[in-house]
């Protein structure tokens, strides 16, 4: 009553009147309702939003937008609206002053509306100042205001049309003007304002249009339409992609995660374990002695912190970093879930309307409109939710990849052993992807229970306590699902472990492929990969069985819930009638229930997978980091007067839980000194340099360095970039300095050889450079950086005597470019030693002697004894200044020197060195040096010489042949059986629902019961059982078929890659191949079978829904075909772009892995040059490039879904509309069936297109696997028809007949018309300058490259006519770069297990390794690290010698095999070869000419041609090329 008096002066105007508004054929709202509710609703909306929105804008300033015409118009209209409201208010005051009785509402409403319009105007300007280009808050406000005004407008028009209507001219005119202005404001709010000043969008040449899109465009994803149109017209290219939004870039995302992780680690008080090394107590040792004997065991005392640490929580860190943005998705999801239940409730109203023949028609149309609007709102809310989830997932992946990359740059060497390259790549690819996938569905953890609870609540209202039967079924399923989740986790862990092992092995195979081919070991390693793959597939098969059972329970649970509920409902009381309303409203609710019940186990499974990945990432990110602070660094100006390097009583170790590698190191080096470090293999020379670089853990002592450091590793690390960029290494080009460095490092002649000079791309790991060229590039990089301290780890080993002498004189020596720099040179060359300032003699991890050359000779210690012995025994071959004579023999027992350090026996008990190769503490990377560098320069343009082929994206539609290939890989029987079972499942589902509609139409008997109840129930149950059997069958068939396909596709890929020629690996970045074996194969393993199941399910569901709608309302046939056409067009329109975006994303992913691999291999070089930040930026850039393709693809999904769901919503609209129109001729059961199916069709259509797109985008993985399964292959491995006899070659006679060789068809010859015959048993040396064609000759002999012309005859057989393995098994090579693989030492010697242990031990003894291997705890089963890291380079070289001794073939090739070892090791190898290969033909490519002076012949190559050939003594007499080389080496 009070409200009536508030609305009218006489209290005659109620707020609500059912007779006026509902029970009438011409409904209207009361005046009071119009003046209060319809006027106040927009006001209350804006005022309720204002506080939070104002706070949000205050904290998120995006910049200042200049006043534009659009903004001026909106502001002006806001003032006009305010004026209209105040005019209405003043008019009311005027009326009151005239004595009229006015209702209070006429004063209150204009006042409230006027203040609200003022607030709206203020917000328009405040948004402009804060950089808001389009406001969702304001657009919603104007929309609500317009809708409310529209109802009032209709009422005013109806009133005005009445004859006796009283017209209030002023108020009506004011309202019409108000309505017009609100409509204009709404239209203007649909447009976006200009970009803020100084924003990223203004500066970006290709900005993402999202940032400047209007609110309406953003919620409908209209802003991406331009790209979709472009993609439909022609295939998208990477240049068409927009820049990432700033908030999605690595620059923004990664630092936040890394900082939060650091804070979490501090909170968890995760202190590293301290390890104190102490000797065992020895009562016989003098009390004052502090030095340890190398042979004494060292105890490690592990001192743990007193309090128990908890592990840092990565989940907390992820939540803290991404939670706030992600929380917005909660609101959208909650809104969507609530709107979802509007459908069944409106369905109930429609069924009641159909049953009520007296109800006015407009109510049916209203219900139809409500159903359509609720469906549309549901669509918009759902896809905003998905968009936020996908963007969050993308950001998480970016952050995780960035964090892993940054961590990989700083972890310790012991940590690197526990995380191999393959495992870290998996962290970046598979584990990061798991988080991405989980972000989409994690909200289902709370949403699914909410949906289930609401569904059960509405079911209780509909069916009463009978619903408890359904609840009981669901509760019974909980423990079952829990057990399955635990099992899934177990299988997931096992699967990831197998995958890590496989990727690790594949990485090693790809890095060592050249060695595998030379040894003909491809089959052995193929078997190793397949064994791991077999274990992986076993786990996948178990997971498939589990998935089949899971799918069976998930699909059948909703049906069992419905069956049990209906059964209890109709049997508990005979009077309970299952009518259309109860059945189909319940069925609609059961359909809602189906999704959370189906998705929840999948979400649990995803969470389980993500938890495994979370743990793996946490372990990796928790690895101990190197401590650069362990070495004190001073700048030149701050450290004046100090020595350049000072080391006091320092002890270093490679791993904290292992004994030290270097003990009691003490020395000081003044500024500008040249220091040589000499010693035997494995004595700690390279470790000393690594210690100075802070690559090792310092146990005790003090180390100080003054100035910047440059480092040249023992094995050169080369990037996949141009020669120039490898030398500049991120520094600006200074032409004069650059040329001086190139000349000093003897690189100018090489520029003539390279096709595009220093702009030639030199390939991944420098594949097209020789070993010497790579070493000189590495040296040039260091020299160019102009540092203060140079650490040079044997840089002269891989170059010939002439070049070595040149480099020492021009770069390292007293008159070289570095003459004023502090230099520490690890070397084996005696001739350099008289010119150095200080010599450090290493032995057993200690400094045995130290002093100048003359001081050490005067001291008459081990060094002096060696020099005298060497001079006496070798004087017939070399003078004392032989530039390549090695420093060795320094490990032999000698009397104790002054500081009490013993020099231990070299062979007796060598120190096992963890990392002589300190270039990267990783895989040996240089094995792939091909002599492409020996090409003649022939005016090839710069842009034509790209050695490495970037990963290419296919274009256009995925060919049907790809699907057919996948079906064949599955097996055609299984494929067609799966389709048949899918059909059975959906036919039985349709039949059961149609049966239900017939059941609901049964008329109750006179006594109020249904006569056919039990029959109906039995058939309904039987159809459900048939559905369950079909579900289990197709799920099992698809899963098992998927495993068959995965096995076949992997095998094809592996076999083809291993059978590819070396040229394939030289031009294909390893990242491309790793991508195929990791991400693409994971898609085939895990994704494609799931997508097939969902695609087939969606397809049959859509067909079924259309059939039901057409059966119920045949008139729908008028609208279904046009909507079908729209659907088809939108789908094809979308797929064209989506498919190409997926391809571009896949292609841009490969460089991320390639760069990551490259970084891991050269991490110590990067750290030494302090280039971490530059490499981090490069990595971030590559990740962002990858996400540039991914982001449009997820938005395209949303674009499609919104449009297709609109098509689906139209089907709902027309199904309900036709049901309302035909209500007099339709039964309630058919109406219920039709509308309930139409409610589902939106989801089905959405899933169908998503799954068809997912199918096409994921099948791209098959396409990409097939791409590398069909590349050109090298010649057959075995040819039975031409296989040589087992005794071949019996003498070892090798004949080159007019032999020519080129590396590619478009390149020049590198060997030109070689004609030479080498008799069986001859020992032939092959010499020549760098790039002369020496290595090319061996590549031709092993047919790594096939001949361009001519032939090679071995013992009468043309090697081109026999199989490659027939050839390569019969020739042995000891390569320049010794490559070992992870696995046992025995496997590295004999991968085919052809030889007995006795034969292996004999080979080790002859290779001088027996003592070393015997001292190892596991002997032959000693586990070699990845790339043989835990052996020194010299020890690895001796392992290669042992391989050759085991094979004992008639032809042996040494490709600069002793270049990187000291003279003693060289002598050991040479003496073994002379005795053990006495009857064999030996071809030696040599830099140390003294090793071939006793050979029968020497071949001198120059520019691919034989210049000289003859006995060494003859060639010396000729005084030609060989004589000049011998002279440079000091041999004449």
From Swiss-Prot:
Residues engaged in binding ATP 2: 1328-1335
Subcellular location: Cell membrane; Basolateral cell membrane
Effect of residue 1101 to N: 50% increase of estradiol glucuronide transport
Gene Ontology biological-process entries: astrocyte differentiation; carboxylic acid transmembrane transport; cell chemotaxis; cellular response to amyloid-beta; cobalamin transport; cyclic nucleotide transport; export across plasma membrane; glial cell differentiation
Expressing tissues: Skeletal muscle, brain, heart, spleen, lung and kidney.
Modification after translation, per record: Glycosylated.
Keyword Transferase belongs to the record: no
Regulation of activity: MK 571 inhibits sphingosine 1-phosphate and leukotriene C4 export.
UniProt domain ABC transporter: residue ranges: 645-869, 1294-1528
EC numbers, comma separated: 7.6.2.2, 7.6.2.3
Every ABC transmembrane type-1 domain range: 326-609, 975-1257
GO molecular function annotations of the record: ABC-type glutathione S-conjugate transporter activity; ABC-type transporter activity; ABC-type vitamin B12 transporter activity; ABC-type xenobiotic transporter activity; amide transmembrane transporter activity; ATP binding; ATP hydrolysis activity; ATPase-coupled lipid transmembrane transporter activity
Topological domains, Extracellular: 1-33, 96-100, 155-172, 339-364, 463-465, 570-591, 989-1026, 1112, 1226-1227
Sites bearing Phosphoserine, chain numbering: 290, 879, 883, 916, 931
InterPro entries, A to Z: AAA+_ATPase, ABC1_TM_dom, ABC1_TM_sf, ABC_transporter-like_ATP-bd, ABC_transporter-like_CS, ABC_transporter_C-like, Aldo/ket_reductase_CS, MRP
Reactions catalysed according to its record: ATP + H2O + xenobioticSide 1 = ADP + phosphate + xenobioticSide 2; an S-substituted glutathione(in) + ATP + H2O = an S-substituted glutathione(out) + ADP + phosphate + H(+); sphing-4-enine 1-phosphate(in) + ATP + H2O = sphing-4-enine 1-phosphate(out) + ADP + phosphate + H(+); leukotriene C4(in) + ATP + H2O = leukotriene C4(out) + ADP + phosphate + H(+)
Residues holding ATP 1: 679-686
PTM sites of type N6-succinyllysine: 504
Enzyme category, top tier: translocase
SMART domains: AAA
Glycan attachment residues as annotated in the record: 19
Modified residues (Phosphotyrosine): 277
Family stated for the protein in its record: Belongs to the ABC transporter superfamily. ABCC family. Conjugate transporter (TC 3.A.1.208) subfamily.
Function according to Swiss-Prot or TrEMBL: Mediates export of organic anions and drugs from the cytoplasm. Mediates ATP-dependent transport of glutathione and glutathione conjugates, leukotriene C4, estradiol-17-beta-o-glucuronide, methotrexate, antiviral drugs and other xenobiotics. Confers resistance to anticancer drugs by decreasing accumulation of drug in cells, and by mediating ATP- and GSH-dependent drug export. Hydrolyzes ATP with low efficiency. Catalyzes the export of sphingosine 1-phosphate from mast cells independently of their degranulation.
NCBIfam families: MRP_assoc_pro
Name of this chain's protein: Multidrug resistance-associated protein 1
């Amino acid at each position: 009553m009070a409200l009536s008096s508030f609305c009218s002066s006489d209290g005659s105007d109620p707020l609500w009147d059912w007779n006026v508004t509902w029970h009438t054929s011409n409904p209207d709202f009361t005046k009071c309702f119009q003046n209060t509710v319809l006027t106040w609703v927009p006001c209350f909306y804006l005022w309720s939003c204002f506080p939070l929105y104002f706070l949000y804008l205050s904290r998120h300033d995006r910049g200042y937008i200049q006043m534009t015409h659009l903004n001026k118009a909106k502001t002006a209209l806001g003032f006009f609206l305010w004026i209209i409201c105040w005019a209405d208010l003043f008019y009311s005051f005027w009326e009151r002053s005239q004595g009229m009785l006015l209702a209070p509402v006429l004063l209150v409403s204009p006042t409230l509306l006027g203040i609200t319009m003022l607030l709206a105007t203020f917000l328009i300007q405040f948004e402009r100042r804060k950089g808001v280009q389009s406001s969702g808050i304001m657009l919603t406000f104007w929309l609500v205001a317009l809708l409310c005004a529209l109802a009032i407008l209709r009422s005013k028009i109806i009133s005005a049309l009445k004859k006796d209507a009283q017209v209030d001219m002023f108020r009506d005119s004011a309202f019409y003007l108000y309505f017009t202005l609100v409509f204009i404001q709404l239209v203007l709010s649909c447009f976006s304002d200009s970009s803020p000043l100084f924003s990223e969008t203004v500066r970006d040449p290709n900005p993402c249009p999202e940032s400047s899109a209007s609110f309406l465009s953003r919620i409908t994803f209209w802003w991406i339409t331009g790209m979709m149109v472009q993609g439909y017209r022609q295939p998208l290219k990477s240049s068409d992609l927009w820049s990432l939004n700033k908030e999605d870039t690595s620059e923004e995302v990664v630092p936040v995660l890394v900082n939060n992780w650091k804070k979490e680690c501090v909170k968890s008080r995760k202190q590293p374990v301290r390890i104190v090394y102490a000797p065992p107590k020895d009562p016989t040792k003098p009390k004052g002695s502090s030095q340890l004997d190398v042979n004494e065991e060292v105890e490690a005392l592990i001192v743990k912190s007193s309090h128990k640490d908890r592990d840092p929580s990565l989940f907390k860190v992820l939540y803290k970093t991404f939670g706030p943005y992600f929380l917005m998705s909660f609101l959208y999801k909650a809104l969507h879930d609530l709107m979802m239940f509007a459908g069944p409730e409106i369905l109930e109203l429609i069924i009641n309307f159909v049953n009520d023949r007296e109800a006015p028609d407009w109510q049916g149309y209203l219900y139809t409109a409500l159903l359509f609007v609720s469906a549309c709102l549901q669509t918009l809310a759902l896809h905003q939710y998905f968009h936020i989830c996908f963007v969050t997932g993308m950001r998480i992946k970016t952050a995780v990849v960035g964090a892993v990359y940054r961590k990989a740059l700083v972890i310790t060497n012991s940590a690197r052993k526990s995380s191999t390259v393959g495992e870290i790549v998996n962290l970046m690819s598979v584990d990061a992807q798991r988080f991405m996938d989980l972000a989409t569905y994690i909200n289902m953890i709370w949403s699914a229970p909410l949906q289930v609870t609401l569904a059960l609540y509405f079911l209780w209202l509909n069916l009463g306590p009978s619903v408890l039967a359904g609840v009981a079924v669901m509760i019974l399923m909980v423990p079952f699902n829990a057990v399955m989740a635990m099992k899934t986790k177990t299988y997931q862990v096992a699967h990831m472990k197998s995958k890590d092992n496989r990727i690790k092995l594949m990485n090693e195979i790809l890095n060592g492929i050249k060695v595998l081919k030379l040894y003909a070991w491809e089959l052995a390693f193929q078997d190793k990969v397949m064994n791991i793959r077999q274990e992986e597939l076993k786990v996948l098969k178990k997971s498939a069985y589990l998935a089949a059972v899971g799918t069976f329970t998930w699909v059948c649970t909703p049906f069992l819930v419905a069956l049990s509920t209906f059964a209890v409902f109709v049997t508990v009381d005979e009077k309970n009638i299952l009518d259309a309303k109860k059945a189909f409203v319940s069925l609609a609710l059961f359909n809602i229930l189906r999704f959370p019940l189906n998705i929840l186990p999948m979400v649990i499974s995803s969470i389980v997978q993500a938890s495994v990945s979370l743990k793996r990432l946490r372990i990796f990110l928790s690895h101990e980091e190197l401590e650069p602070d362990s070495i004190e660094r001073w700048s030149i100006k701050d450290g004046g007067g100090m020595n350049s390097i000072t080391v006091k009583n320092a002890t270093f170790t490679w791993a904290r839980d292992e004994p030290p590698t270097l003990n009691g190191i003490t020395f000081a080096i003044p500024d500008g000194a040249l220091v040589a470090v000499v010693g035997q293999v494995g004595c700690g020379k390279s470790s000393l340099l690594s210690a100075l670089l802070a690559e090792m853990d310092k146990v005790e002592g003090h180390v100080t360095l003054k100035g910047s450091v440059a480092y040249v590793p023992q094995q050169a690390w080369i990037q996949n970039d141009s020669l120039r960029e490898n030398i500049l290494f991120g520094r600006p080009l200074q032409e004069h300095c650059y040329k001086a460095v190139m000349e000093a490092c003897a690189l100018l002649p090489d520029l003539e050889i390279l096709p595009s000079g220093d702009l030639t791309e030199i390939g991944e790991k420098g594949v097209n450079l020789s070993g010497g060229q790579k070493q000189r590039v590495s040296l040039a990089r260091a020299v160019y950086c102009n540092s203060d301290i140079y650490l040079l780890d044997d840089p002269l080993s891989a170059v010939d005597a002439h070049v070595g002498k040149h480099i020492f004189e021009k770069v390292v020596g007293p008159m070289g470019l570095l003459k004023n720099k502090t230099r520490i040179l690890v070397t084996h060359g005696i001739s350099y030693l008289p010119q150095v300032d200080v010599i450090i003699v290493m032995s057993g991890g200690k400094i045995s002697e130290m002093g100048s050359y003359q001081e050490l000779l005067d001291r008459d210690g081990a060094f002096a004894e060696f020099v005298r012995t060497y001079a006496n025994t070798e004087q017939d071959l070399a003078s004392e200044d032989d530039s390549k004579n090695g420093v060795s023999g320094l490990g032999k027992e000698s009397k104790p020197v002054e500081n009490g350090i013993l020099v231990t026996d070299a062979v007796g008990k060598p120190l096992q060195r963890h990392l002589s190769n300190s270039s990267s503490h990783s895989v040996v990377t240089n094995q792939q040096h091909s002599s492409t560098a020996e090409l003649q320069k022939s005016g090839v343009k710069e842009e034509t010489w790209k050695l490495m082929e970037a990963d290419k994206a296919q274009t256009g539609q995925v060919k049907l042949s790809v699907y057919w290939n996948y079906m064949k890989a599955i097996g055609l029987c299984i494929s067609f059986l799966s389709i048949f079972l899918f059909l059975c499942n959906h036919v039985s589902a349709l039949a059961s629902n149609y049966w239900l509609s017939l059941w609901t139409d049964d008329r109750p008997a006179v006594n109020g019961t249904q006569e056919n109840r039990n029959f109906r129930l039995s058939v309904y149950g039987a159809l459900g059982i048939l559905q369950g059997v079909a579900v289990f069958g197709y799920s099992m068939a698809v899963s098992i078929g998927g495993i068959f396909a995965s096995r076949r596709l992997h095998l094809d890929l592996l076999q083809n890659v291993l059978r590819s020629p070396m040229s394939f690996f030289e031009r294909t970045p390893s990242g491309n191949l790793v991508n195929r074996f990791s991400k693409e194969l994971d898609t085939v393993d895990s994704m494609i079978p799931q997508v097939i199941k969902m695609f087939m399910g969606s397809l049959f569901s859509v067909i079924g829904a259309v059939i039901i709608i057409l059966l119920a309302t045949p008139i729908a046939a008028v609208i279904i075909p046009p909507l079908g056409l729209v659907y088809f067009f939108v789908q094809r329109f979308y797929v064209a772009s989506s498919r190409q975006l997926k391809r571009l994303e896949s292609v841009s992913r490969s460089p991320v892995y390639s760069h990551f691999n490259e970084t891991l291999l050269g991490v110590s070089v990067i750290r030494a040059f302090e280039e971490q930040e530059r490499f981090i930026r490069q990595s971030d850039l590559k990740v962002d490039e990858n996400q540039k393709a991914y982001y449009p693809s997820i938005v395209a999904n949303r674009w499609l879904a919104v449009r297709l769901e609109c098509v689906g919503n139209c089907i709902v609209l027309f199904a309900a509309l036709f049901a309302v129109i035909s209500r007099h001729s339709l039964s309630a059961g058919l109406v219920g069936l039709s509308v309930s199916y139409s409610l589902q069709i939106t989801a089905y259509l959405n899933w169908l297109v998503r799954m068809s797109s997912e199918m096409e985008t994921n099948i791209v993985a098959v396409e990409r696997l097939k791409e590398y399964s069909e590349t050109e292959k090298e010649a057959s491995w075995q040819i039975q028809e031409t296989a040589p006899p087992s005794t071949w070659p019996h003498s070892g006679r090798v004949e080159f007949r007019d032999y020519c060789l080129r590396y590619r068809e478009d390149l020049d010859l590198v060997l030109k018309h070689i004609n030479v015959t080498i008799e069986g048993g001859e020992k032939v040396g092959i010499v020549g300058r760098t790039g002369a064609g020496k290595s090319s000759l061996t590549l031709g002999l092993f047919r790594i490259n096939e001949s361009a012309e001519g032939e090679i005859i071995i013992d009468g057989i043309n090697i081109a006519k026999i199989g490659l393995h027939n050839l390569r098994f019969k020739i042995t090579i000891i390569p320049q770069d010794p490559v070992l693989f992870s696995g046992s030492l025995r496997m590295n010697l004999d991968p085919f297990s052809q030889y007995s242990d006795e034969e292996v031990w004999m080979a080790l003894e002859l290779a001088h390794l027996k003592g070393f291997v015997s001292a190892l705890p596991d002997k032959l089963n000693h586990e070699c690290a990845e790339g043989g890291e835990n052996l020194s380079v010299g020890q690895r070289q001796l392992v290669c010698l042992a391989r050759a001794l085991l094979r004992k073939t008639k032809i042996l090739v040494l490709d600069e095999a002793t270049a990187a070892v000291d003279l003693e090791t060289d002598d050991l190898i040479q003496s073994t070869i002379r005795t053990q290969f006495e009857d064999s033909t030996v071809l030696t490519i040599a830099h140390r000419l003294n090793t071939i002076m006793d050979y029968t012949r020497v071949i001198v190559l120059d520019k691919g041609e034989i210049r000289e050939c003859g006995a060494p003594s003859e060639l010396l007499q000729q005084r030609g090329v060989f004589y000049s080389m011998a002279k440079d080496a000091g041999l004449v």
